[in-house]
């Protein structure tokens, strides 16, 4: 789970609302986003570096190695960031590896409410990572 500064509260609220479902999964999050999620939900989250310190790239590496089945990335389309190239690279790798990606609450709600979200046999990213 990743969120830009202006979207962190939205992602934390989404995680709180979906705590029961998320607790069944291995969760990864970048820096402050992950810390906030842990503080507000008590979910077990593997904390990576902050996005601008390489956390986005760490998530990308996890995707490339078949460790991420879904990407929840609430990004701010109205704010330009110094690490925009990292954001673009993360979104590119998610598409390349066929990882369902949510960039806002509505899409995240659709992904988590899909019967495929908890289906262990549905792993399109892992199939792509084997190539």
What are these regions (language model features)?
Residues 2-23:
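N-terminal phosphate-binding or glycine-rich loops at protein starts, especially the Walker A/P-loop
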Residues 24-33:
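Short internal beta-strands
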Residues 28, 91-111:
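Short, acidic/small-residue loops that bind anionic groups at enzyme active sites
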Residues 44-47, 64-66, 89-90, 118-122:
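Short, hinge-like loop/turn segments at secondary-structure boundaries
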Residues 55-94:
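Mid-chain, well-packed structural core segment of small domains
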Residues 105-131:
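Short, glycine-/small-residue-rich phosphate/pyrophosphate-handling segment
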